[in-house]
C-alpha cells in the first residue's frame, strides 16, 4: 500500500477540487512551497495511491499540465477518505495502529522507512519500533519475513499465498474481528463492497449453501483483497496438481461464474488461479447445516479422527461421550470442514480463542493434548483455533449430560401456602435454575427433622422467615418475582464462593515443594523459563528428561496463558513419573501469547489423578479472577511466605 504524506495529500486535494481541469506543475509548487522536481516525484506516488484505492486516472498532457479524471461519487468518497485518515491516525489506539502498520506493510510492494511510518501515525520512533517487532513476530507464523534494507526501508518478503493468509488473519493482532472487517471494507467504495456482498449471497441462494456468518464475511474479505492484489499485479500462484484437482469440482464452476460477474465492476480479469483459490475457501468454509451431497463427509480420515477424539476425551474426562449423538454430528460437520481447510492449506481465525482458553482452561488444554496425539498419528496440523471450537462442542455435551444426570445444589422448599403454591414455586426454580435439584417441598414445622435425616442438603428456599437453621437459606415470595430471581442467583453464587473458602489449602500446595518454587526470576523468553522449570522437575525425579523439549513444543502449538498474568505450561502426561508443580514469579512481566505474564505454574500432572486435576484447574480459574491476590503472590520474595499464601 502506497503511503502519501501531508504534502502529497494537499496536492491530491488540489486535484480533487479541480476535476477535469489542467493544473501545471508550477501551480502545485507554489501552493505547497517546494521544487517542481519534488512535485513530479509526488505525482508518481499519488498515481500509485490512486491505482490502489480508486478507479481515478491521473492524466498528463505535455504543454497543458495534469488533471484528475474521476467520477463524482468517487471524488466525494476519496475526499472523505483523505480527511478521515488525517484525523483518525492521531486518535488510534496502540493495537489499531499496529493493525494499520501490518496491513500497509503487507499491501506495499515497495520498501518504506520506519521514519515514514512514525510520521504517518504521529508517534515517535521508539513506539513504532515496538509495533514493528510485534508485527515481525506475528508475520513469522505465516513464513513471512520483515526485511530491513539500508537506505530503502522495510518490506515484507514471502510468497503471495502466505501474504494472503496473513491479510485474512490480521485480526489476530488486535483480537477484534468486527473492527478489522470494517477496516478492510473501508479501503473500498461502498458500492464495490455491496456488489460483492450481493454476488456471494446470490451464490449461496442459487446452490443452497449455508455458510456461517463468519465464513460469509471471510469470503467477502478474501474477494475484496483478491481484487486489490490483482490490481497491484500481485497474483496468487498454485501448483498444477492443485489447479487440476479443484477445477474438477462443481464449486469451481460456481465460483468462476461469480467472478465473471464481478469483472466489469472492478475493470479487471480474474485469472484461473484466483478462481481456484477462492474455490478453495468456499470448499473450506464452515456451514450451519450439513450439506446433503455425495461429497459430504467423504474424507476417509474423518471417522478415525472423530473416533480418536471422542475416545481420548472420554477416557481423560471419565465421561462417556459416545452416546451423545448431537456431539458426534457436530464433530463430524466441524472436523470435515477442518480437514478440508487443512488439505487446501487454508487458515482459520477464532475471535473467541482467548475467551475460551480463560473460561474452560482444563477442557481446552486437555483437547490440545489430545490433538497433539491426533496430529502425530494422522500427520495433521490442527491448530489451537480449532481446539477452541472443539472445546465448545465438548462443553455443550458436558452441560447436556450434567443437566440430565447430575445437579450442583440440593435444595428443599419451605412454603406456607399449600401444595399448589409449593409446586408452582418448585417448577419455577427447576426451570430457571438447572444447577438446583429440589428434593422436597415441606412445611416449616418439618424442616429441622428433614435436615437431620438429609445432611447433604445445600440450601433451603423459604417463603417465610426461618430461625436457628444451620443450612444456608433464603426467603423469597411464593411467586418468585423478577427482582427475587436476581437475589436468588446472587445467593447461589455466594454458596459456590463459600464452598471455595472452606477448602483451606490450594490443591497445588499439596503438589509442590520449596525446592520447586522460583521467585523474582529474570527470563528473556517464555521458552527459556519453561526449560528452567522442566529441568527442576527432572532433577527432582518427577518427569523424564524429554519433558522440557515437549513442553516447549506444546507451548508453540498453543500459548498457555489463561488471563490475569498467569500461565500454565505443561507437556504430555506420558513423560510424567509423579505429579508435581513447579512455580515461578517474574521480576518483570514476560510476553506470553497475547498478554504479559508474571505468575507461572508448570503442571506435571498424571491423567490418573482426575480428582486432583479438576480441583487444580478450578483453583487456577479462581486465581485468574483474583488480580489482587495474584499481585500479592508475584511481589513476594520469600519462598515459605509465598507458599503460606496458598494455605489460608
From Swiss-Prot:
<feature type="modified residue" description="Phosphocysteine; by EIIA">
    <location>
        <position position="415"/>
    </location>
</feature>
<feature type="modified residue" description="Phosphohistidine; by EIIB">
    <location>
        <position position="570"/>
    </location>
</feature>
<dbReference type="InterPro" id="IPR036095">
    <property type="entry name" value="PTS_EIIB-like_sf"/>
</dbReference>
<dbReference type="InterPro" id="IPR036634">
    <property type="entry name" value="PRD_sf"/>
</dbReference>
<feature type="modified residue" description="Phosphohistidine; by HPr">
    <location>
        <position position="222"/>
    </location>
</feature>
<feature type="modified residue" description="Phosphohistidine; by HPr">
    <location>
        <position position="334"/>
    </location>
</feature>
<dbReference type="InterPro" id="IPR016152">
    <property type="entry name" value="PTrfase/Anion_transptr"/>
</dbReference>
<dbReference type="GO" id="GO:0003677">
    <property type="term" value="F:DNA binding"/>
</dbReference>
<dbReference type="InterPro" id="IPR002178">
    <property type="entry name" value="PTS_EIIA_type-2_dom"/>
</dbReference>
<dbReference type="InterPro" id="IPR013196">
    <property type="entry name" value="HTH_11"/>
</dbReference>
<feature type="domain" description="PTS EIIB type-2">
    <location>
        <begin position="409"/>
        <end position="500"/>
    </location>
</feature>
<feature type="domain" description="PRD 2">
    <location>
        <begin position="297"/>
        <end position="404"/>
    </location>
</feature>
<protein>
    <recommendedName>
        <fullName>Transcriptional regulator ManR</fullName>
        <ecNumber>2.7.1.191</ecNumber>
    </recommendedName>
</protein>
<feature type="modified residue" description="Phosphohistidine; by HPr">
    <location>
        <position position="393"/>
    </location>
</feature>
<keyword id="KW-0804">Transcription</keyword>
<dbReference type="InterPro" id="IPR036388">
    <property type="entry name" value="WH-like_DNA-bd_sf"/>
</dbReference>
<dbReference type="Pfam" id="PF08279">
    <property type="entry name" value="HTH_11"/>
</dbReference>
<comment type="function">
    <text>Positively regulates the expression of the mannose operon that consists of three genes, manP, manA, and yjdF, which are responsible for the transport and utilization of mannose. Also activates its own expression.</text>
</comment>
<feature type="domain" description="PTS EIIA type-2">
    <location>
        <begin position="510"/>
        <end position="648"/>
    </location>
</feature>
<keyword id="KW-0805">Transcription regulation</keyword>
<feature type="domain" description="PRD 1">
    <location>
        <begin position="187"/>
        <end position="292"/>
    </location>
</feature>
<dbReference type="GO" id="GO:0009401">
    <property type="term" value="P:phosphoenolpyruvate-dependent sugar phosphotransferase system"/>
</dbReference>
<dbReference type="InterPro" id="IPR007737">
    <property type="entry name" value="Mga_HTH"/>
</dbReference>
<keyword id="KW-0808">Transferase</keyword>
<dbReference type="GO" id="GO:0008982">
    <property type="term" value="F:protein-N(PI)-phosphohistidine-sugar phosphotransferase activity"/>
</dbReference>
<dbReference type="GO" id="GO:0006355">
    <property type="term" value="P:regulation of DNA-templated transcription"/>
</dbReference>
<dbReference type="Pfam" id="PF00874">
    <property type="entry name" value="PRD"/>
</dbReference>
<keyword id="KW-0597">Phosphoprotein</keyword>
<keyword id="KW-0238">DNA-binding</keyword>
<feature type="modified residue" description="Phosphohistidine; by HPr">
    <location>
        <position position="281"/>
    </location>
</feature>
<comment type="similarity">
    <text>Belongs to the transcriptional antiterminator BglG family.</text>
</comment>
<dbReference type="GO" id="GO:0016301">
    <property type="term" value="F:kinase activity"/>
</dbReference>
<dbReference type="InterPro" id="IPR011608">
    <property type="entry name" value="PRD"/>
</dbReference>
<dbReference type="InterPro" id="IPR050661">
    <property type="entry name" value="BglG_antiterminators"/>
</dbReference>
<dbReference type="Pfam" id="PF00359">
    <property type="entry name" value="PTS_EIIA_2"/>
</dbReference>
<dbReference type="Pfam" id="PF05043">
    <property type="entry name" value="Mga"/>
</dbReference>
<keyword id="KW-0677">Repeat</keyword>
<dbReference type="InterPro" id="IPR013011">
    <property type="entry name" value="PTS_EIIB_2"/>
</dbReference>
<keyword id="KW-0010">Activator</keyword>
<keyword id="KW-0418">Kinase</keyword>
